[in-house]
């Protein structure tokens, strides 16, 4: 991993997020411009992409709320009710629901640039003792928006291709993803929102194979059990329900380069289409 974080080419830059944090550390906002590369073949932003937005803004707010301690993500739940279309900007409004001695809980509301609700998410975090390598979040608290994008930052391929997703067995939802400098978090592991994207992709391919229908994931519940530092990260899905209109699946994600250690358990629901 490079010394500076994020490196010059990194998903945090290429997604062109912008952020704004209040100075009291109780609320944050983020904006994501939706481009074609972030969308499924239905033409709307992938659930994993929006989970990544939630993870980034929620994680930053949780770290500020837990200061001077640090945090580790325990779980993320996302529910989408409407499609986020190319050319729109998704706004994520995050607020602290609880900031205790051992736990921080964040709620994130998602809307488009016409203030239509797109979905909602919650995240919970374990509070940990600070270590020397943990970032100092106090510098992020300001009244003005900021971004990690630079002039050349942009996606040059569809999001799953940029992540390096390879389908090994569609029926089993078996996919493989490398852990690279582009996808690592500040701890040197696959970034949490990208782990959710792996769950999204695994469930999608399994449910499409099971139903013969072009279902898209609309709901994710992700429990983070460990880091994926070595890679490749591998996922497989067990289909729980499958019909032409709706499906659900359970997904396990392991770090195959670290004795196939279990990293994540997730559940996903998919439907034929989201409202526009």
Spans of features found by a protein language model:
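Terminal targeting signals and extreme-terminal segments of soluble enzymes
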Residues: 1-276
């Amino acid at each position: 991993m490079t010394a500076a974080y994020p490196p010059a080419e990194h998903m945090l830059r290429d997604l062109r997020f912008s952020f704004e944090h209040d100075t009291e550390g109780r609320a944050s906002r983020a904006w994501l411009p939706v481009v074609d590369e972030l969308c499924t073949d239905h033409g709307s932003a992938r659930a994993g992409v929006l989970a990544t937005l939630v993870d980034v803004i929620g994680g930053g707010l949780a770290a500020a709320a837990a200061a001077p301690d640090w945090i580790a993500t325990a779980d993320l739940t996302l529910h989408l009710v409407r499609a986020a279309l190319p050319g729109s900007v998704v706004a994520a409004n995050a607020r602290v629901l609880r900031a205790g001695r051992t736990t921080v809980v964040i709620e994130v509301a998602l809307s488009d640039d016409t203030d239509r609700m797109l979905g909602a998410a919650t995240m919970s975090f374990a509070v940990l003792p600070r270590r020397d390598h943990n970032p100092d979040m106090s510098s992020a608290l300001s009244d003005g928006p900021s971004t990690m994008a630079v002039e050349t930052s942009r996606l040059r391929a569809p999001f799953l291709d940029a992540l390096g997703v390879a389908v090994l067995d569609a029926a089993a939802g078996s996919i493989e993803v490398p852990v690279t400098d582009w996808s690592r978090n500040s701890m040197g592991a696959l970034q949490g929102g990208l782990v959710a994207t792996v769950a999204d992709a695994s469930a999608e391919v399994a449910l499409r194979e099971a139903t013969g229908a072009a279902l898209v994931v609309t709901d994710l519940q992700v429990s983070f059990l460990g880091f994926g530092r070595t890679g490749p990260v591998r996922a497989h899905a067990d289909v729980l329900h499958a019909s032409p209109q709706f499906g659900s699946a359970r997904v396990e994600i392991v770090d195959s380069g670290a004795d196939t250690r279990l990293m994540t358990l997730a559940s996903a629901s998919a439907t034929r289409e989201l409202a526009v």
